């Protein structure tokens, strides 16, 4: 994962609890135990229907994968760009700050048939890296905010934050509960990325 290489072939079927246990092992090994936050994936109804599940999934953010706003990345084939909301939540899981965020995901499955719900969980939802913008104090008005991604003056994505788990506030509530149930570390000022809004944009050279 750290080398952005193709994933190994999955040699057996996993149920979701088994996949989450494997994910924790993978994430700790990849991040040298330095986890920077929690991410949500498969956060809208259409994608859940595709993966034949009735809920979203969660994974870990690698602490060393947080990038500065002015970063330059080498091109990697298959990388996708997702527009998201970043939240800092308190010890009860309520949002206290919000920022725009970009997440880069890299689905590098050896076989397309392995891109299942359990496969996504096992590889930590294809997490690669992420950028978090300027923080602002939380307000319920952000539940109906929109995000826009612009590339070379053209709009590449424009979507409502409500597309991911019905908006940031509900996303925080669900992620806090799900993370606690799945054994993720939680505390005051935990970072959440609440899931893709709009389409995942293929990264291009330039």
Language model segments and positions:
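Catalytic-core "active-site belt" of small-molecule-metabolizing enzymes
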Residues: 1-173, 177, 181-182, 202-205
């Amino acid at each position: 994962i750290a080398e952005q290489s193709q994933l190994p072939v999955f040699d057996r079927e996993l149920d979701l609890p088994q996949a989450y246990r494997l994910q924790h092992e993978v994430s700790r090994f990849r991040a040298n135990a330095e986890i920077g936050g929690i991410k949500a994936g498969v956060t809208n109804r259409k994608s859940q229907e595709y993966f034949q599940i009735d809920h979203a999934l969660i994974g870990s953010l690698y602490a060393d994968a947080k990038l500065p706003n002015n970063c330059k990345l080498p091109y990697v084939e298959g990388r996708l760009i997702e527009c998201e909301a970043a939240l800092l939540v308190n010890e009860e899981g309520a949002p206290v700050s919000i920022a725009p965020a970009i997440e880069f995901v890299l689905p590098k499955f050896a076989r397309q048939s392995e891109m299942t719900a359990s496969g996504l969980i096992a590889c930590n939802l294809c997490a690669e890296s992420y950028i978090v913008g300027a923080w602002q104090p939380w307000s319920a008005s952000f539940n109906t905010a929109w995000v826009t991604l612009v590339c070379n003056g053209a709009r590449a994505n424009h979507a409502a934050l409500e597309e991911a788990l019905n908006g940031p506030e509900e996303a925080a509530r669900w992620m806090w509960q799900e993370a606690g149930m799945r054994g993720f570390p939680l505390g005051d000022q935990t970072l959440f990325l609440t899931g893709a809004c709009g389409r995942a944009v293929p990264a291009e050279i330039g």
